[in-house]
């Protein structure tokens, strides 16, 4: 793996915004692994301002919050979760150039 631990974790936490990647993680059984679930909890440090300022896609923190919730298995078994996430991402990317779009 190339890059520092910081760079790898920055890239990974932002990949959580990608519904296709989340589908793949689900199909591969990663969310059934306690080690993986612990890693997701560890990534909560990205919420602190000293780290979150580096995020290009800060909405990944909302996804991370969902992934660390008790009912995540129910959410991941529902295709509507992935569809809604994809629609939200599209809307964010579509409107990001507009001043004050997220206020």
UniProtKB/Swiss-Prot annotation:
PANTHER family annotated for this entry? MEDIATOR OF RNA POLYMERASE II TRANSCRIPTION SUBUNIT 31 (PTHR13186)
Q: What GO cellular component entries does it have? A: mediator complex
Q: Please indicate which superkingdom the organism of origin belongs to.
A: Eukaryota
Q: What is its main location?
A: nucleus
For this chain's UniProt record, which GO biological process terms are given?
regulation of DNA-templated transcription
Question: Localized where?
Answer: Nucleus
**Can you tell me which family this protein belongs to?**
Belongs to the Mediator complex subunit 31 family.
Give the UniProt keywords, A-Z: Activator, Nucleus, Transcription, Transcription regulation
Pfam family for this entry, one: Med31
Subunit info here reads: Component of the Mediator complex.
What organism does the UniProt record list as the source?
Encephalitozoon cuniculi (strain GB-M1)
> What name does UniProt use for this protein?
Mediator of RNA polymerase II transcription subunit 31
Q: What does this protein do?
A: Component of the Mediator complex, a coactivator involved in the regulated transcription of nearly all RNA polymerase II-dependent genes. Mediator functions as a bridge to convey information from gene-specific regulatory proteins to the basal RNA polymerase II transcription machinery. Mediator is recruited to promoters by direct interactions with regulatory proteins and serves as a scaffold for the assembly of a functional preinitiation complex with RNA polymerase II and the general transcription factors.
Point out the gene that encodes the protein. Answer: SOH1
GO MF terms held by the record: transcription coregulator activity
């Amino acid at each position: 793996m190339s890059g520092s631990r910081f760079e790898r974790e920055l890239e990974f936490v932002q990949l959580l915004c990608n519904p296709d990647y989340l589908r793949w993680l689900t199909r591969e059984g990663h969310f059934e692994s306690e080690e993986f679930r612990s890693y997701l909890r560890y990534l909560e440090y990205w919420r602190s301002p000293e780290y979150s300022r580096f995020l290009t896609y800060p909405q990944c923190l909302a996804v991370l919050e969902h992934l660390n919730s008790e009912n995540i298995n129910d959410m991941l078994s529902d295709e509507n979760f992935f569809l809604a996430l994809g629609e939200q991402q599209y809307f964010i990317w579509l409107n990001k150039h507009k001043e004050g779009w997220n206020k």
